[in-house]
Amino acid sequence: ASHRWHPRHKPNKTVLRVEADIDGYVKLLREIIVNGYDAASPRIARRWDKSAGKWRDISEPRLWPDQYVHHAVIQVLEPVMMRGMDKFCCGSIKGRGIHYGMKAIKKWLRTDKKGTKYSEELDIHHFYDSLTKETVMASLRHLIKDRRMLDVCERLMKYGVLIGAYFSQWFANTVLQ
């Protein structure tokens, strides 16, 4: 998939270089994945999360090849992961954002025969911090039978299931299924 820039953002030099030779970089990306991808240590940035009202340590994996590998793996695994996912799992899923969840809750409250008036929003305290590679791999083994893909998934998590890495939100949702 080609990178879509925000109209006011300056395109990243790495993205420009990759998109100038897409065929060459696709072949190179395939070689990297097939020959044993090794994740580089991500840069950790401390960011203020307005919605949660606290500081978060966000990992920033390198754009090439790390983020491209993350997206390539998830493109392949998305249909498999979506198959068993709850219809109302809204976190970080394309087409299922906060509005999707809010619309469902409003409908439930409106059409509930028992007259429910309230709903609850829950959060798992330090969820990403508590996820281990072993826990995620156990969940993935139930969904994925290809040993090579499982090996790539394990290599993605060399530094853990990090907030900020694209694959992390998908793997976290898989654990919650």
Regions from the PLM with identified roles:
Residues 1-31:
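Non-catalytic, polymerase-adjacent accessory regions of viral genome-replication enzymes
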Residues 2-11, 49-52, 81-85, 118:
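Short acidic (Asp/Glu) and glycine-rich catalytic loops that position anionic groups and cofactors
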Residues 28-54, 68, 145-159:
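Reverse-transcriptase-like RNA-dependent polymerase core
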Residues 51, 62, 94, 109, ...:
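Short, flexible loop/turn elements at secondary-structure junctions
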Residues 54-85, 128, 159-177:
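Conserved pre-motif C helix in the palm subdomain of viral-like polymerases
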Residues 70, 74, 78, 94-103, ...:
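Well-ordered mid-protein domain cores that form the structural environment of catalytic cofactors
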Residues 85-94:
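Short, glycine/acidic-rich hinge or "gate" loops at secondary-structure transitions
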Residues 104-177:
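Conserved polymerase palm-domain catalytic core
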